[in-house]
């Protein structure tokens, strides 16, 4: 307990976290891009390598997932302006949002309907490629659509893949691994939604359920893989491959911004708000964006008030050496994708010099925002995907120290805010109706 008292004294915001209040934190350790990138374990070459690999797999993806045919086997999501939602937020919060507001709809990514379709699918594809190359069954010059054959499925069936997940990562790893022919086991934490487990089982995935939280599910997945040399473990807490799969999103987003004639430069800053669980998804996307836009992009992570693991790890500098449970927070939230008590140390340390800040949002707020987005834009997201939505309001507050510190108070008016909508299109209709109803009840209170 002594250590916790010392933390509270050193970082007064810890008291607000313990009280599960909504907070906004500006990262004092952010550095200029050129300084930060020099010490980074990853760089542009790593992201380019991931991009090339996804291009090699595109013919296979287009063949086995017809919903990606139109995009030539590239798994990508729309970027849309949400002007009606912007007006609604300004009215409800009695505060202007300076600049344009857009939504990146990773909720509608093909195959698994969430941001995890980026990193999760990429890591499985990379593993499959390595196995096939090692065994002389494939060369990088081949048309990868040959993977859709009994020969390859029979080969991959000798191997297994394991992952621990609160839901969405399990969906992407499970669906992709099963499609290739791997034996796949998803270790699901207590907060994983039933429909996600049902969907995985319908695809032939072995789902193991736990009463404990996310960290336990990951630990069990790791143990399974350790005991079996033919089993590959997708390590959501430490994986560079997952991170790089997410980072590829940046160059795709750049093209979409250009198509919308949206400029990003020193006079037109870009602000991006990313829901954060263990950190891989938002960390990878933010890293990719920093590589492209350097000091002209400002990335913020958003977490539930009951699971602020990354904020706690970054603020105290303890990273994965501290969990929210250590300071008495229960890690119980309806934002199942973000219900993580201990952050990734790899992501925290990698992103510390690049990240602008972090904030928390209550479950009640997520439901209200869910209902509002459905009403104004007819876009339905799952609760955790709405965490980014109050980011622009936080940043545009008159007293926001970040804008002042970065001399953006005037520039923000010509800037762009992108809220990353991380999941939702695969939520069954009855479940989504329940979410909407809850949002309606909370709005009427």
Swiss-Prot record:
Catalysis performed (reactions): D-serine = pyruvate + NH4(+)
The protein's required cofactors: pyridoxal 5'-phosphate
Keyword entries, A-Z: Lyase, Pyridoxal phosphate
Enzyme class: lyase
EC code: 4.3.1.18
GO MF term set: D-serine ammonia-lyase activity; hydro-lyase activity; pyridoxal phosphate binding
Superkingdom: Bacteria
GO biological process: D-serine catabolic process; isoleucine biosynthetic process
PTM annotation (N6-(pyridoxal phosphate)lysine): residues: 116
UniProt record similarity statement: Belongs to the serine/threonine dehydratase family. DsdA subfamily.
NCBIfam families: D_Ser_am_lyase, PRK02991.1
The name this protein goes by in its record: Probable D-serine dehydratase
Naturally occurring in which organism (per UniProt): Bacillus mycoides (strain KBAB4)
């Amino acid at each position: 307990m002594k250590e916790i008292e010392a933390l509270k004294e050193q970082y007064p915001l810890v008291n607000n976290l313990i009280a599960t209040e909504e907070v906004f934190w500006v990262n004092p350790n952010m550095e200029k891009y050129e300084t930060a990138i020099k010490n980074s374990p990853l760089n542009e070459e790593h992201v380019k390598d991931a991009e090339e690999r996804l291009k090699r797999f595109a013919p296979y993806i287009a063949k086995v997932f017809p919903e990606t045919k139109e995009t030539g086997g590239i798994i990508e999501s729309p970027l849309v302006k949400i002007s009606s939602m912007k007006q609604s937020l300004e009215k409800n919060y009695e505060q202007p949002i300076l600049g344009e507001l857009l939504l990146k709809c990773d909720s509608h990514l093909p195959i698994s309907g969430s941001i995890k379709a980026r990193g999760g699918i990429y890591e499985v594809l990379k593993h499959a490629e390595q196995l096939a190359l090692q065994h002389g069954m494939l060369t990088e010059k081949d048309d990868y659509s040959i993977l859709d054959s009994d020969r390859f499925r029979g080969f991959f069936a000798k191997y297994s893949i394991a992952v621990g997940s609160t839901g969405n990562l399990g969906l992407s790893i499970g669906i992709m691994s099963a499609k290739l022919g791997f034996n796949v086991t998803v270790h699901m934490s207590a907060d994983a939604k039933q429909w996600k487990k049902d969907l995985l089982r319908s695809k032939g995935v072995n789902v193991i359920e736990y009463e404990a939280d996310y960290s336990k599910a990951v630990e069990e997945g790791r143990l399974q893989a350790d005991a079996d040399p033919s089993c590959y473990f997708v390590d959501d807490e430490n994986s560079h491959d997952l991170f790089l799969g997410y980072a590829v999103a940046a160059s795709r987003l750049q093209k979409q911004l250009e198509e919308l004639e949206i400029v990003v430069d020193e006079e037109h800053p870009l602000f991006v708000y990313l829901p954060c669980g263990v950190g891989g998804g938002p960390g990878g996307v933010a890293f990719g964006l920093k590589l492209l836009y350097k000091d002209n992009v400002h990335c913020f992570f958003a977490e539930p008030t009951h699971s602020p693991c990354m904020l706690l790890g970054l603020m105290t500098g303890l990273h994965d050496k501290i969990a929210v449970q250590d300071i008495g927070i229960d890690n119980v939230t309806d934002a199942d994708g973000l219900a993580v008590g201990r952050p990734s140390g790899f992501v925290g340390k990698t992103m510390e010099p690049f990240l602008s800040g972090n904030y928390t949002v209550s479950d009640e707020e997520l439901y209200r925002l869910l209902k509002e987005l459905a009403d104004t834009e007819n876009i339905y997201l799952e609760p955790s995907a709405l965490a980014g939505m109050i980011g622009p309001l936080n940043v545009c507050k008159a007293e926001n120290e970040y804008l002042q510190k970065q001399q953006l108070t005037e520039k923000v008016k010509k800037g762009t805010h992108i809220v990353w909508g991380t999941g939702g299109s695969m939520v069954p209709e009855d479940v989504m109706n329940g979410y909407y109803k809850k949002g309606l009840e909370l709005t009427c209170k």
